[in-house]
């Protein structure tokens, strides 16, 4: 996947997000870039990376896997780990360039809050990796991509500001970063004294997301392995 368009997005997506934030908000580029990142750009990026990681095997009838002297479980876990590294890497790149620009524009988000926020985004998006991989193995690239991106766009803000936000895992990322980015999930600045500035939701949100990661990885492998055995 090193030379694919999806891999290039790991580097270009943060740059495009920063440019978009600057065009739309000028000196308030930080807030705009972070908001566009977790509401649209990052969901699309994670979905494309995850789907691209598995689509080649599906298109070749799983022969790429069957020919390897390695267990399918190790291949599945290895793909997930590779995507985890890419997800953290692209989030840290966004933080780096956004923070650098912040020194020349309005520093609306401090470097430390920006770093914590980007790490939280990575952690709370990880569970979608095995889910999209599984969907791709079952449905193909474009159906899985459309379903994943559509779910993010529709569900990421539903209930994000409610006490029951944890029931909607797609809303967890936009909720847990509120106190660090200082804005509502819709991008509007938080009012002083807003309950969304309370960081109590962070740990439960991360724990739920990581639990889903483990669950999706296990369920995904079981169903993926059944698909591999059909071609054996």
Predicted feature locations:
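Hydrophobic alpha-helical transmembrane segments of polytopic membrane proteins
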Residues: 113-143, 211-219
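Membrane-interfacial helix-loop-helix connectors in multipass membrane proteins
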Residues: 97-118
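Long, hydrophobic alpha-helical segments
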Residues: 33-56
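Terminal transmembrane helical anchor/hairpin motif
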Residues: 28, 150-231
